[in-house]
Regions:
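Non-catalytic, polymerase-adjacent accessory regions of viral genome-replication enzymes
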Residues: 1-48
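Short, conserved non-catalytic motifs in the polymerase core
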Residues: 29-37, 62-89, 103-115, 175-191
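Active-site-proximal segment of RNA-dependent polymerases
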Residues: 3-8, 89, 93-141, 145-148
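Active-site-flanking structural segment that lines cofactor/substrate pockets
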Residues: 43-74
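Conserved polymerase palm-domain catalytic core
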Residues: 127-191
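Non-catalytic, well-ordered alpha-helical scaffold segments
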Residues: 2-5, 18, 44, 48, ...
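Generic hydrophobic/packing signal
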Residues: 54, 58, 71-73, 84, ...
Length: 191
């Protein structure tokens, strides 16, 4: 497939930036927080600053804090970034996600809107009904600490094969290389 360019223009569109602002600040708890109150009071300036940073390719996730959560019986260490940075990351990843989704095979389901476990289950059931002998056995597995084991260089190779916009690739590299090894859990880019 061809590499995609001119993505920055899509990212900095006012509609995309506005949607990202609303998505990050959804819910009354976030709006009442100190960061949320500041962002709401200075919305035009914040969006203007983020648009300028993204358009010039200088946006970087500056700082994060780690938090441990228990989800599904597993202990996970996630990285939490400030809301202002989260708006920019969301704006970038919304457009990147739209371009990547076209390249996924139909049975890719994890973390994809209007797909997921039940959508994939329908495919598995259909395949089992159509070919009972070929689907008699299955192998159930779980990759332990998957995001921590992903090779950053391989992800960068994949990103550079899809996108040719150098500014975008540089910003995505800053998301990918945020952690010493593996991918960050908590950034939208890990989904």
């Amino acid at each position: 497939m061809r590499r995609v360019g001119y993505i920055i223009e899509e990212i900095v569109e006012p509609s995309n930036m506005e949607a990202s602002f609303r998505q990050v600040l959804r819910g009354s708890k976030r709006k009442r927080s100190r960061q949320g109150c500041y962002l709401l009071a200075h919305k035009p300036e914040v969006l203007e600053e983020l648009v300028a940073q993204i358009a010039s390719g200088t946006f970087r996730v500056k700082d994060y804090r780690e938090r441990e959560i228990i989800e599904g019986g597993k202990l996970r260490r996630i990285q939490v970034i400030p809301m202002k940075d989260r708006i920019a990351v969301h704006a970038i990843m919304a457009v990147v996600d739209r371009h990547l989704r076209k390249r996924f095979i139909r049975t890719t389901s994890a973390s994809i809107k209007r797909r997921g476990m039940h959508d994939l289950l329908a495919y598995v059931r259909r395949d089992m009904a159509e070919d009972p002998d070929g689907t008699r056995y299955c192998y159930k597995f779980d990759i332990t600490k998957f995001y921590e084991s992903v090779k950053q260089d391989f992800v960068m190779y994949c990103v550079s094969r899809v996108f040719k916009d150098a500014k975008l690739v540089t910003m995505l590299e800053s998301f990918i290389r945020l952690m010493p090894e593996g991918l960050s859990i908590g950034l939208r880019s890990s989904q």
